[in-house]
A protein has these predicted regions:
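Iron-sulfur-associated redox domains of electron-transfer enzymes in respiratory
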Residues: 1-160
Length: 161
């Protein structure tokens, strides 16, 4: 999915449809992606990430970015669409200044639940179907995704159609 998102964002930047992309980049730790603004294809290809740790809601960052010149591309997970719609309803975000792409999400992984299972030193994760493999400094551990899914994700159960 990450590659498709980067490809689409690069195309929209290249043809001038958008001026910037609001997404995620790796934080200090593998389990802590942080919201980021990208203004070039090179920056996207170098630092953009979308994985099972990308739980941050990007909608609130549009309040300021929608006032900037040009359009901002935002990738919206199903649960984030609630807050984006509310910001639009309250006129806190200019609709004409954003380009929205809905992205699928079948739940994000909780770093706290991984730790509760005795796993430390996370370096990355890979997801294959319903199995999440947590790679650490000490080896790999496999989990069923539902066992380490963020509680918020379990409750929402909403998907883009």
């Amino acid at each position: 999915m990450q590659e498709v998102m980067i490809e689409r964002a690069c195309a929209l930047l290249a043809d001038g449809t958008v001026s910037r992309v609001l997404g995620w980049k790796n934080g200090e730790f593998a389990y802590d992606p942080t919201p980021a603004v990208f203004d070039s294809a090179e920056a996207l290809q170098k630092a953009f990430v979308y994985n099972d740790f990308c739980a941050s809601n990007l909608s609130k960052y549009l309040i300021k970015l929608s006032r900037a010149e040009g359009k901002t591309l935002i990738f919206v997970k199903p649960c984030d669409s609630y807050s984006l719609n509310q910001l639009l309803t309250e006129h806190r975000v200019k609709r004409e200044s954003i380009y929205v792409i809905g992205v699928p999400c079948d739940g994000k992984v909780s770093e706290n639940k991984i730790r509760e299972n005795g796993v430390e030193g996370v370096t990355s994760i890979t997801t294959e179907g319903e199995t999440v493999t947590v790679h650490t400094l000490y080896g790999d551990t496999a989990f069923q995704k539902t066992d380490i899914m963020d509680d918020r994700c379990i409750k929402i159960g909403r998907a883009h159609v």
